[in-house]
Amino acid sequence: PHDYPHDVAYRTSFTGTELSRIRIPSRAERRDKSVQGPDTGWPTPEPPHRINQIYIEPILFAHAESMAQLRIICRTQVTHYEQDDTGVTAWANDLDGGEPLRIRCDYVVGCDGGRSMVRKAIGATFTGVDTVARVQSTLIDAPDLLKHIAVKPAWATFSVNPRRSGNVYAIDGHRRWLVHNYLRTEETGFDAVNRDWAIRQILGVDAQFHYD
């Protein structure tokens, strides 16, 4: 929504005590030049917009599909590749049980996420700490969640407590939320964590609270 705050809040949980807040104007507030925020002074005629990839990707996908020189293959996993003097041959599996694919190309680029199999196979590495590979992301539908907070909503909420730390991002400003659950050092993988329990600790809700 145009009037939804772009703020970043820090709380003991999404519904818990607020510790601090970075105030960032909503799209509607940016029309008032007297309203200030950390990004209101950027030298650009187009102010920042908080738009999740679930809205952007269909637009980009449709544009890519309209280009005759592109072929998009979904639900396909590259398993290995071989490089020679003239290019690269990659082998992939159809995740819906179809025939294996042999793909001949000039280049292979690892753009398949933080835990990218392709990136690892070609030896490309991150710089810094690969924390992104240890974040369990869950998109939830919780239309009643905003009823449980006593303060103004925020675009991003950092949940910090001894039980679980994570982030909650507003997707549509009403009912859709992206919950990031950060794995602890001793947790070897996502299977080591009860996802539902972790989400409830980050949100600060009990077992009776319903979300999908």
Locate each region found by the language model.
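A conserved short coil-to-beta-strand element within the FAD-binding core of flavoproteins
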Residues: 74-89
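Conserved FAD-binding catalytic core of PHBH/FMO-like flavoproteins
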Residues: 62-63, 89, 107, 111-212
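Active-site-adjacent segment of FAD-dependent monooxygenases/related oxidoreductases
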Residues: 1-66, 82, 143-146, 156-162, ...
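A generic structural motif
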Residues: 11, 91-95
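Core beta-strand elements of the Rossmann-like FAD/NAD(P) dinucleotide-binding domain
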Residues: 96-107, 111
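Membrane-interface helix/loop caps of multi-pass membrane proteins
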Residues: 39-51, 90-92, 118-119, 180-182
